[in-house]
Amino acid sequence: MKNGTTRSWCSILQMALVLVALAHLAYSSDKKPQAYRDINAIGHREIGYPTGVGNWYSLDKEKEIGTQASATFEKSTSLLRDPLTESYLDRLAQTIARNSDAQLPIMIRVIDSEDCYALTFAGGHLYITRGLLLRLQNKGELAASIARGVAHTALRSATGEATRTRLLGIAGFPVIGQDPPLPVNGTDSAFADKLVLLSYRRKDELAADYFGIQYLYKSGYAPECFGSFVQKAWPSSAKATFSPFPPLKTRLDALQKEINEILPKQSSAITDTEDFEAFRRHLLELPLPKPFPKQPVLIHSGSQKLD
């Protein structure tokens, strides 16, 4: 009798977890509230996976995890330590952050590599390669790259995905297509390590496009620059971040639809500036990048359990 009661409670618990998991999946559906379409509501709306059922990690916890992940990543990655470059990118990143829904501070660094890709870690840590910086043709495309990373931060994509993976794992369902899988149990540092290689789901990638182009527009840049940035970064970023990006045409069509239906016409929008040309010339004058590992060497540095 006791065993039967235990099994019944286990079944009830599993069903409850299934419902919670389904609620989380429903939260990430394609339906978008009116506020998501309102440019004037930017900065006054919560677009990301909210703390609770949709996200088991508080903003403070996410910030802590992101700090651990970026520190681990940087131990095996060559960064471009150039004050002029860092200052230029930081000013642009802060401008976009002020015109976004991000609830975490934004930090941006340059990976000293000729490869072309960008990375966004939990907690507002953005990385862009020197190769991608040199491939971009104008300041609008650079702003688009940063706006997309800011959108991932606002969406809380990393910890939202981690929560969904853990929910489905606890409920007894194998998570298909998660590469690499996040641990259900483990240390904070191990979890941070996994975030380094976390592949965002297709819906999260489309959402980053959807909100990123709004932040680009709100910051005064021509929204068309977002599409041209995606076309330049698409092949390399898909390979470098191990993410299941949607087809390029799907993304470009969605961006054009958003431009036509949501973004009001601008009387004057920034595409390029003289300071960008000076910035690009400065990059070309710097010494060539030094070789570094293609993938970060994951270093475990703590043993504190996840809350």
Residue ranges of each PLM-predicted region?
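Post-HExxH zinc-binding segment in Zn-dependent metallohydrolases
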Residues: 168-199
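A short, glycine/Asx- and small/polar-enriched loop/turn
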Residues: 120-124
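Hydrophobic h-region of N-terminal signal peptides that target proteins for export
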Residues: 18-26
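Short pre-active-site segment immediately N-terminal to the catalytic Zn-binding motif
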Residues: 130-144
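Zn2+-dependent metallopeptidase catalytic core
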Residues: 84-100
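C-terminal capping/extension segments of zinc metalloprotease domains
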Residues: 11-14, 26-71, 78, 98-117, ...
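Catalytic Zn2+-binding segment of zinc metalloproteases
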Residues: 140, 150-166
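Bacterial N-terminal signal peptides that target proteins for export
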Residues: 2-15
